[in-house]
Amino acid sequence: MSLSIFEKLQLADEKNLLIQGLPSSIEKQFSKLSFAKNVTPLLKNRKIDFALVFAVNEVQLNGILRDVMPNLKENSKFWVAYPKATSKIVTDLNRESSWNQLTGGGYESIERIELDHVWSALRFTRCEMEAVVNG
Protein backbone atom coordinates (compact mmCIF):
# COMPACT_ATOMS: atom_id res chain seq x y z
CA MET A 1 0.00 0.00 0.00
CA SER A 2 1.42 3.37 -0.95
CA LEU A 3 1.57 6.22 1.51
CA SER A 4 -0.72 9.22 1.15
CA ILE A 5 0.85 12.57 0.38
CA PHE A 6 0.14 13.64 3.99
CA GLU A 7 1.94 10.56 5.35
CA LYS A 8 4.92 11.21 3.07
CA LEU A 9 5.09 14.81 4.32
CA GLN A 10 4.61 13.66 7.94
CA LEU A 11 1.76 16.12 8.28
CA ALA A 12 0.07 15.46 11.60
CA ASP A 13 -1.77 18.02 13.71
CA GLU A 14 0.23 21.14 12.86
CA LYS A 15 -1.94 24.26 13.05
CA ASN A 16 -0.20 27.04 11.09
CA LEU A 17 0.25 25.61 7.60
CA LEU A 18 1.80 27.25 4.55
CA ILE A 19 1.59 25.64 1.14
CA GLN A 20 2.91 28.10 -1.41
CA GLY A 21 2.93 27.68 -5.18
CA LEU A 22 0.79 24.53 -5.14
CA PRO A 23 0.51 23.23 -8.73
CA SER A 24 -2.96 22.51 -10.07
CA SER A 25 -1.86 18.94 -10.89
CA ILE A 26 -1.81 17.99 -7.18
CA GLU A 27 -4.04 20.69 -5.71
CA LYS A 28 -6.96 18.26 -5.32
CA GLN A 29 -4.98 16.18 -2.80
CA PHE A 30 -4.88 19.21 -0.48
CA SER A 31 -8.52 20.27 -0.92
CA LYS A 32 -9.67 19.19 2.57
CA LEU A 33 -6.76 20.94 4.27
CA SER A 34 -6.89 24.47 5.64
CA PHE A 35 -3.68 26.33 4.78
CA ALA A 36 -2.29 29.73 3.85
CA LYS A 37 -1.04 30.19 0.27
CA ASN A 38 1.54 32.81 1.23
CA VAL A 39 3.10 34.32 4.33
CA THR A 40 0.31 36.39 5.88
CA PRO A 41 0.58 38.84 8.79
CA LEU A 42 -1.17 36.21 10.94
CA LEU A 43 1.43 33.57 10.03
CA LYS A 44 4.23 36.04 10.76
CA ASN A 45 2.71 36.57 14.20
CA ARG A 46 2.05 32.91 15.01
CA LYS A 47 5.01 31.44 13.10
CA ILE A 48 4.75 28.52 10.69
CA ASP A 49 4.43 24.94 11.99
CA PHE A 50 4.50 23.28 8.56
CA ALA A 51 5.62 24.67 5.20
CA LEU A 52 5.63 23.13 1.74
CA VAL A 53 6.84 25.51 -0.96
CA PHE A 54 7.00 24.77 -4.67
CA ALA A 55 9.59 26.40 -6.92
CA VAL A 56 10.67 25.83 -10.52
CA ASN A 57 13.98 27.69 -10.41
CA GLU A 58 16.55 28.98 -7.96
CA VAL A 59 15.62 32.66 -8.36
CA GLN A 60 11.97 31.89 -7.52
CA LEU A 61 13.02 29.66 -4.62
CA ASN A 62 15.29 32.31 -3.12
CA GLY A 63 12.47 34.88 -3.27
CA ILE A 64 10.12 32.50 -1.48
CA LEU A 65 12.75 31.62 1.13
CA ARG A 66 13.31 35.29 2.02
CA ASP A 67 9.66 35.43 3.15
CA VAL A 68 9.36 31.96 4.66
CA MET A 69 12.60 31.27 6.55
CA PRO A 70 12.29 34.09 9.14
CA ASN A 71 8.75 32.92 9.98
CA LEU A 72 9.44 29.25 10.67
CA LYS A 73 9.26 27.89 14.20
CA GLU A 74 12.39 26.18 15.55
CA ASN A 75 10.89 22.74 14.95
CA SER A 76 8.83 23.44 11.82
CA LYS A 77 8.39 20.74 9.23
CA PHE A 78 9.80 22.49 6.17
CA TRP A 79 9.67 21.02 2.67
CA VAL A 80 10.83 22.46 -0.65
CA ALA A 81 9.28 20.88 -3.75
CA TYR A 82 11.01 21.08 -7.12
CA PRO A 83 10.41 19.50 -10.54
CA LYS A 84 11.99 16.12 -11.20
CA ALA A 85 14.53 15.96 -14.02
CA THR A 86 12.08 13.75 -15.94
CA SER A 87 9.20 16.23 -15.56
CA LYS A 88 9.85 18.22 -18.76
CA ILE A 89 9.66 21.42 -16.68
CA VAL A 90 12.69 23.61 -17.35
CA THR A 91 14.44 24.01 -14.00
CA ASP A 92 17.84 24.68 -12.49
CA LEU A 93 16.87 22.99 -9.20
CA ASN A 94 17.98 19.48 -8.32
CA ARG A 95 18.55 17.47 -5.19
CA GLU A 96 22.34 17.89 -5.28
CA SER A 97 22.58 21.68 -5.51
CA SER A 98 20.50 24.87 -5.49
CA TRP A 99 20.13 25.00 -1.72
CA ASN A 100 22.77 27.64 -0.86
CA GLN A 101 20.33 30.05 0.78
CA LEU A 102 19.02 27.25 3.01
CA THR A 103 22.40 25.80 3.96
CA GLY A 104 23.79 29.30 4.48
CA GLY A 105 20.83 30.00 6.77
CA GLY A 106 21.66 27.04 9.02
CA TYR A 107 19.42 24.40 7.42
CA GLU A 108 20.30 20.97 6.10
CA SER A 109 18.41 18.48 3.98
CA ILE A 110 17.39 15.37 5.91
CA GLU A 111 14.91 13.58 3.65
CA ARG A 112 13.66 13.39 0.05
CA ILE A 113 10.26 12.18 -1.13
CA GLU A 114 8.31 11.99 -4.38
CA LEU A 115 5.03 13.90 -4.30
CA ASP A 116 3.92 12.64 -7.72
CA HIS A 117 5.38 11.94 -11.18
CA VAL A 118 6.40 15.61 -11.59
CA TRP A 119 7.45 16.85 -8.14
CA SER A 120 10.04 15.77 -5.57
CA ALA A 121 10.44 17.44 -2.19
CA LEU A 122 13.35 17.83 0.21
CA ARG A 123 12.78 18.27 3.92
CA PHE A 124 15.03 20.76 5.65
CA THR A 125 15.68 21.22 9.33
CA ARG A 126 17.82 23.62 11.31
CA CYS A 127 21.23 22.07 11.87
CA GLU A 128 21.16 22.62 15.63
CA MET A 129 17.70 20.97 15.83
CA GLU A 130 19.09 17.83 14.21
CA ALA A 131 21.98 17.81 16.68
CA VAL A 132 19.55 18.02 19.59
CA VAL A 133 17.32 15.26 18.20
CA ASN A 134 20.20 12.91 17.42
CA GLY A 135 22.59 14.05 20.14
Language-model-detected regions and their locations in the chain:
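Conserved acidic residues
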Residues: 15, 48-49
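Short acidic low-complexity segments
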Residues: 37-48
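N-terminal, charge-rich interaction modules
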Residues: 1-32
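Conserved Class I S-adenosyl-L-methionine
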Residues: 92-111
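Class I S-adenosyl-L-methionine
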Residues: 106-135
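Beta-hairpin (beta-strand-turn-beta-strand) motif
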Residues: 56, 83-85, 115, 127
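Short, glycine-rich nucleotide/cofactor-binding loops
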Residues: 51-61
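Mid-chain, well-packed structural core segment of small domains
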Residues: 61-93
